[in-house]
Amino acid sequence: MAFLTHLLVCVFGMGSWVAINGLWVELPLLVTELPEAWYLPSYLTVVIQLANIGPLLVTLMHRFRPGCLSEVPVIFLILCVGTAACILLAFLWNVTSWIQGGQHSVAFIVLTFFLALVDCTSSVTFLPFMSQLPTYYLTTFFIGEGLSGLLPALVALVQGSGITTCVNVTETPGTTLNTMETPITQGNLSPSLPSPSWHQESRYLAPRFSPLLFFLLLSFLTGCCLVAFFLLQRQPWGRQGSIEDLLHSQVTLHSIRPRDTEDTSSLGAPVSSPGKGSVEASVASLRPAQLAFIYSVVAFVNALTNGVLPSVQTYSCLPYGPVAYHLSATLSSVASPLACFLPIFLPNRSLLFLGVLTVLGTGFGAYNMAMAAMSPCPVLQGHWGGEVLIVLSWVLFAACLSYVKVMLGVILRDRSRSALLWCGAAVQLGSLIGALLMFPLVNVLKLFSSADYCSLDCSV
């Protein structure tokens, strides 16, 4: 029974961000099919940030009408909306509309907004629901949340999305002949025709399965989350679960009591490890300057990971080829949840260490941004070393800053519930600032340049 409950909690947590994570890892294929092309990531970044209206409304309801809004019907509603949006996306992802003199993926962008609305709102509804369960299920929930990024990334790796080959194209007036690898000899052409011109173009290879099947898989995963939540609702929680919680974790009970000096001995001492008291004391004694540093780092890190760098990933990776872009998008999505597991085994609460790790991750992000600014001819373009460096840079960027985000959340969680509330506000503020900063740079000022990989000539 306990194993089944852990499984349900894991599947429930997996549904929190599986749809949006799935969209990001599918981008290497989508940018080749949709009219927005290289601009698509910046559009998605802004759309996802606009979807924060959902958690904002839920938070305002809890603030001004406490007790009026129950998480259970909200969770049922958003999971039903998410499943329906994924199903519609499977059939409408490539439907375009003519707007302001050009084709645009209106259906895709609108459905992405609803998926983002679901996933953003899950941040302020899933965790309050988990507070009804015994504390030891919370770790299982976060493992499931990590799988929401890992599973779509693995599926995208199998799919092989966005892979291309270069073909030779010969052109004469009124005639265009294509060959895949060997050029057409001039002896096959009529002597009366002018000399042909040659160049290379990209031809995208068909993935192992289509976006239709990929989005149907996302629909299945979201539907599994809905079923898991329904079954969790039918579990006999209540008083028995509360008693279990108290028996399994007296430290949790101690941590929510007032942190008076006389409180730090009796209840927590028998059950906590020798270092636990010092950890709680250090968390409780955080100075305002330290808290300001933590919130600033939270906002800065999320601005980079959720707003700034995703907007230019195509420009930093595609000049090295579609394989580099495909691996960067998928492996960074794998690295992020794996890095989220590290604090379970290798926790480090030192603000100095987390600051150094933030600088290191920012360095990798700066390299990615520099390559995007130099597009379509970045450093080592056309050399295998450049491909390896850009993939490693994106993976390490995601891993370093994901670890920082988790550890700062752990520090604030141990301080108070209101600290976590302000942490969430810093996350959304940083993400919003990053998205609003990059959208005009990419789509209005057009500071980043795109080009066909096969026709690039960066020798000059």
Curated annotation (Swiss-Prot):
Cystine pairs: C377-C454
Gene Ontology CC: one annotated term: plasma membrane
Extracellular topology ranges: 28-37, 93-105, 159-211, 313-326, 372-387, 440-460
Membrane topology designation: Multi-pass membrane protein
Ranges per topology, Cytoplasmic: 1-6, 59-71, 127-137, 233-291, 348-350, 409-418
GO biological process terms, semicolon-separated: cellular response to heat; flavin adenine dinucleotide biosynthetic process; riboflavin metabolic process; riboflavin transport; sensory perception of sound
Expression tissues: Within the small intestine, it is particularly expressed in the jujenum and the ileum. Almost negligible expression in the stomach, duodenum, and large intestine.
Entry-linked Pfam families: SLC52_ribofla_tr
Transcription keyword on record: no
Domain of life: Eukaryota
Family: Belongs to the riboflavin transporter family.
Name of the featured protein: Solute carrier family 52, riboflavin transporter, member 3
Biological source species: Mus musculus (Mouse)
Chain's gene name: Slc52a3
